């Protein structure tokens, strides 16, 4: 594939020990040699070596930076192109200067995700593996990173390719049936083979979809909304879980006027914690905006932490709020157990029925462990499944698998109903195409561009 040479900073901007400028493309080594001065020309050194030298401005002859340069020659590289990585001291000014010099002497600034896109276009990885690269970068927990690494290694890809190959074998048998319709024994054998193989494919798709709920949570986080009357301790709970003071905690009811969101690792489960403004009628315009956002957050939540105040008796407002959330996955928390108990716990139990109940004191940090265990148990039965198994964690993949399950079921129904094989062939082919979209073999250029545009620069 004839592509130009791209360049980008591949490390986070800011002060640090090391900053890396990466080049990839047919002119990568040549461009670097125009700037690099060391014991040998980079063009003359072996592949996969690191070389000490300096970056020199060819025009002013000024020494710009002391560097270590990695030379990686195609095809045994991430992009399957020649790659140069210039390791600089991690300062904004210097690394930008090196980047500008690479562009001055022939490289183009890379688009977001373009290095990974080239790896995909050059056949180094497929689309699901490319998406997993960004999942790995963005992972919030050890489990999430392991799920992403599993996909980077191609385990999901291998399963999808296996199912697509099975469909091709069915289609080949169907073609024989279509070409020789006069042989009844061929038709009977084809129908039997089609049904047997199609049901196995559907079973495998179902197995993958069964991992989707856990996989999606590990990838995106469990959207968890903290809700309750104003001043029951919602923000204190958020702060205790994230060990931060992002939310303002005061004695004035209604001081959380917006939706505050933070990620937290709860026993290996990534929670996307949302602290909402108290949901109540208000004339304050700023607070009213926060209340509306709270209602929206509630409608999108995977888990709701419903907080009550141990120091106050249940009110009609508590009952009204619980009525709003009771049909969702809820954990009820009676907070402020360090204060005098004015709430009737039996009344609380009557209101919530079998809903889990935890008693906490955020001030004394009591009950937090019990809360974390309850969250884990509620969604994962106390233990996430074997980390070596292949999870489907990407919403796009889950959607496509659901479509594939439907089209393979359509093929099964049609075959069992005696529909002509050329009609069954349509559903089988569509299933093959849908599965191909997961790994990028049948994905449109527009979809590919859109997916890679979500990557960070330098990746």
UniProtKB/Swiss-Prot annotation:
Primary site of residence: cytoplasm
One Pfam short name: TrmE_N
GO biological process, one term: tRNA wobble uridine modification
Residues where GTP binds: 231-236, 250-256, 275-278
Record keyword GTP-binding present: yes
UniProt keywords, alphabetically: Cytoplasm, GTP-binding, Hydrolase, Magnesium, Metal-binding, Nucleotide-binding, Potassium, tRNA processing
Note on cofactor: Binds 1 potassium ion per subunit.
Residues binding (6S)-5-formyl-5,6,7,8-tetrahydrofolate: 22, 85, 124, 459
Gene3D superfamilies, sorted: P-loop containing nucleotide triphosphate hydrolases (3.40.50.300), Probable tRNA modification gtpase trme, domain 1 (3.30.1360.120), tRNA modification GTPase MnmE domain 2 (1.20.120.430)
Cofactor: K(+)
Family listed: Belongs to the TRAFAC class TrmE-Era-EngA-EngB-Septin-like GTPase superfamily. TrmE GTPase family.
Subunit record text: Homodimer. Heterotetramer of two MnmE and two MnmG subunits.
Protein name (Swiss-Prot/TrEMBL): tRNA modification GTPase MnmE
Organism of origin: Staphylococcus aureus (strain bovine RF122 / ET3-1)
């Amino acid at each position: 594939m004839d592509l130009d040479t791209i360049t980008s900073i591949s490390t986070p901007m800011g002060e640090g020990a090391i900053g890396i400028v990466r080049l990839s493309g047919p002119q990568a080594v040549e461009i670097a040699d125009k700037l690099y001065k060391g014991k040998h020309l980079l063009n003359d050194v072996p592949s996969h070596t690191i070389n000490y030298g300096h970056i020199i401005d060819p025009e002013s002859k000024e020494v710009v930076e002391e560097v270590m340069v990695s030379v990686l020659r195609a095809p045994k590289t991430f992009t399957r192109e020649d790659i140069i990585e210039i390791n600089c001291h991690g300062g904004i000014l210097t690394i930008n200067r090196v980047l500008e010099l690479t562009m001055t002497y022939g490289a183009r600034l890379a688009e977001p995700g373009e290095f990974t896109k080239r790896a995909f276009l050059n056949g180094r990885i497929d689309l699901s593996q490319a998406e997993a690269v960004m999942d790995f970068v963005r992972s919030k927990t050890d489990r999430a990173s392991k799920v992403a690494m599993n996909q980077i290694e191609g385990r999901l890809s291998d399963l999808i390719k296996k199912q697509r190959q099975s469909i091709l074998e069915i289609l080949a048998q169907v073609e024989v049936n279509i070409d020789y319709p006069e042989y009844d024994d061929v038709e009977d054998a084809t129908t039997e083979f089609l049904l047997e193989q199609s049901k196995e494919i559907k079973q495998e798709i179902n197995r993958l979809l069964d991992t989707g709920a856990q996989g999606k949570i590990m990838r995106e986080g469990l959207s968890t909304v903290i809700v309750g009357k104003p001043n029951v301790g919602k923000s204190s709970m958020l702060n205790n879980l994230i060990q931060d003071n992002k939310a303002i905690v005061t004695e004035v009811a209604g001081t959380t006027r917006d939706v505050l969101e933070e990620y937290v690792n709860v026993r290996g489960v990534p929670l996307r914690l949302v602290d909402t403004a108290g949901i109540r009628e208000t004339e304050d315009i700023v607070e009213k905006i926060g209340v509306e956002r709270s209602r929206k957050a509630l409608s999108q939540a995977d888990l709701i932490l419903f907080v009550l105040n141990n120091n106050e008796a249940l009110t009609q407002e508590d009952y009204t709020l619980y009525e709003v959330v009771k049909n969702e996955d809820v954990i009820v928390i009676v907070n402020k157990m360090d204060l005098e108990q004015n709430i009737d716990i039996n009344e609380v139990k009557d209101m919530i029925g079998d809903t889990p109940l935890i008693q906490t004191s955020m001030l004394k940090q009591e009950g937090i462990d019990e809360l974390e265990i309850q969250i884990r148990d509620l969604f994962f039965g106390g233990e996430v499944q074997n980390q070596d198994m292949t999870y489907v964690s990407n919403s796009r993949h889950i959607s496509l698998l659901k479509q594939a399950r439907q089209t393979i079921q359509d093929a099964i129904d049609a075959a069992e109903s005696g529909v002509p094989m050329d009609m069954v062939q349509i559903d089988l082919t569509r299933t093959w195409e849908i599965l191909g979209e997961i790994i990028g073999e049948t994905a449109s250029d527009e979809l590919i561009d859109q997916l890679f545009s979500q990557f960070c620069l330098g990746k």
